[in-house]
């Protein structure tokens, strides 16, 4: 750790680059899909949890917009992602 102006600066360890790029559209859609599946199973047990239902709708909209973007930009990657995640086409 180094000190600069009385503050501590923590050096971060550089990890090897993973194959996944967390900023990529595919990773974001994958992440949203996992959250959607968790929320859907939660809502099966807790039918009156309306705040979680709203969160689910927001996530569905975000995923739908990302999938529309990917379909417009690169149809091959879109088809591959849809088949991997077992979700319907828009």
Swiss-Prot record:
Q: Which GO terms describe its biological process?
A: translation
Under the heading Gene3D superfamilies, the entry gives:
S15/NS1, RNA-binding
GO CC, sorted alphabetically, is: chloroplast; ribonucleoprotein complex; ribosome
Q: Which UniProt key words apply to this protein? A: Chloroplast, Plastid, Ribonucleoprotein, Ribosomal protein
Q: Name one GO molecular function term.
A: structural constituent of ribosome
Where found? Plastid, Chloroplast
The organism's superkingdom is given as Eukaryota
Which Cys pairs are S-S linked?
none
Alphabetical list of NCBIfam families matching this protein: S15_bact
* Record-stated family: Belongs to the universal ribosomal protein uS15 family.
Name the PANTHER family on file. Answer: RIBOSOMAL PROTEIN S15, BACTERIAL AND ORGANELLAR, SMALL RIBOSOMAL SUBUNIT PROTEIN US15M
What interactions and quaternary structure are annotated? Part of the 30S ribosomal subunit.
Provide the protein name.
Small ribosomal subunit protein uS15c
Species the sequence originates in: Agrostis stolonifera
Gene for this chain? rps15-A
